[in-house]
Amino acid sequence: MPSIEYMTNETSDPYSFPAVGHLYEVDYGGDLLVRFKFHSLSSMTIYGMKGKYKDFVETVKIEVTSIRQDVFMVAWQEENHTTVVHVEDFGEKVIYANITKPGNEFMRIEGPFRRVE
């Protein structure tokens, strides 16, 4: 499996994580709209944009794994011990999220995403 390289703003390598240095917005439907700012391969800030998570902001440590061309698994744990695992498909522009909240409540959601900046 190819290793992931730190990426500048543009690359043609489909195994390089393209999100670093960019802000993305994912619409999970209903009142769940979230933005993710990827600072590096190990740091990201989450912004809740509407609904019950509006004004939520947290910077988390992330782990990024290349699954295949243009598809990456991104995992993190939030301060309240919520654990999130994304499969981010940059070819199809969709994120699949598996979330385990404190108390073992499990959610599986998905939605389209777009680069904001």
Residue ranges and their predicted role:
Residues 4-7, 75-117:
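Beta-sheet ligand-binding and adhesion/scaffold domains
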Residues 24-28, 46-49, 74-78, 97-100:
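Short beta-strand segments that buttress and anchor functional surface loops
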Residues 32-62, 102:
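N-terminal glycine/threonine-rich, aromatic-flanked beta-hairpin/loop signature
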Residues 42-45, 71-72, 93-95:
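Hydrophobic residues embedded in beta-strands of well-ordered beta-sheets
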